[in-house]
């Protein structure tokens, strides 16, 4: 009898603990003040927290802002790009890419300034993950260690370290000479792509952001460009502008059905 009573009490304690964690996680999402320095910290403090919009204040930063936290997978990812349809245009100018646009629960771009504020603390290391969905039901991913952006004066120059995944290292390119690591961000009104012009067969390219239809860290255009025009199933192959990760679906330009880019502190 005594053993049964202890077991029942144990179950009661565990149930109460789980309920408390669940309530705390919901309160976190509804709170208006900062709930952590980034999504990774929130997840570590509350492993039961669900995916959704949270308020964060990066270490050493005076301002706080909303982000979408992906708490599935291994938890604690801060989403900075999401594409799943054509309702939100990504063909925008510098200020829009700097400050962000879209709905954080749907398709959006968090903003280069916010990503810089997250990653500028050199005492922390960050991993970037790119998730891709094709039009045939398949998925792929690419992860990069030591992700970081420089400030606006350096045009939010990209740095990535070691690659792992099954989508291919499109950031460094499908062939030599188009490595986007170390390149600044380009938009239709601010060109940093290194083309003057770039020659592709019989085509002379002067502005990659213009032909690709969205802002990106272009290096003579390159093999990665996930902010171009979205294309529906059946019309997703052969376009110069698209959701391109050319090491994943060669040789013709294949535009992904959906993409998500996110970072995590490690």
Located regions from the model:
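Mature extracellular or lumenal effector domains of secreted proteins
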Residues: 2-266
């Amino acid at each position: 009898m005594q053993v049964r009573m202890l077991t029942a009490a144990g179950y009661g304690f565990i149930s109460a603990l789980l309920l408390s964690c669940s309530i705390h996680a919901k309160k976190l999402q509804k709170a208006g003040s900062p709930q952590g320095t980034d999504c990774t910290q929130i997840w570590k403090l509350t492993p039961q927290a669900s995916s959704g919009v949270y308020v964060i204040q990066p270490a050493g930063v005076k301002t706080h802002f909303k982000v979408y936290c992906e708490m599935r997978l291994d938890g604690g990812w801060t989403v900075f790009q999401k594409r799943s349809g054509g309702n939100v245009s990504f063909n925008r100018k510098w200020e829009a890419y700097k400050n962000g646009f879209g709905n954080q629960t749907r398709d959006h771009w968090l903003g280069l300034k916010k990503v810089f504020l997250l990653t500028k603390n050199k005492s922390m290391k960050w991993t970037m993950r790119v998730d891709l969905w094709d039009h045939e039901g398949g998925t792929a991913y690419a992860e990069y260690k030591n992700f970081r952006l420089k400030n606006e004066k350096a045009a939010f120059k990209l740095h990535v370290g070691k690659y792992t995944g099954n989508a291919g290292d499109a950031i460094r390119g499908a062939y030599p000479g188009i490595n986007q690591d170390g390149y600044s961000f380009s938009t239709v009104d601010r060109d940093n792509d290194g083309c003057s012009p770039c020659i592709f067969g019989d085509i002379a390219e002067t502005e990659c952001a213009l032909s690709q239809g969205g802002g990106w860290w272009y290096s003579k255009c390159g093999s990665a460009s996930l902010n171009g025009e979205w294309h529906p199933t059946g019309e997703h192959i052969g376009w110069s502008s698209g959701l391109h990760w050319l090491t994943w679906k060669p040789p013709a330009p294949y535009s992904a059905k959906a993409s998500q880019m996110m970072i995590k502190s490690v």
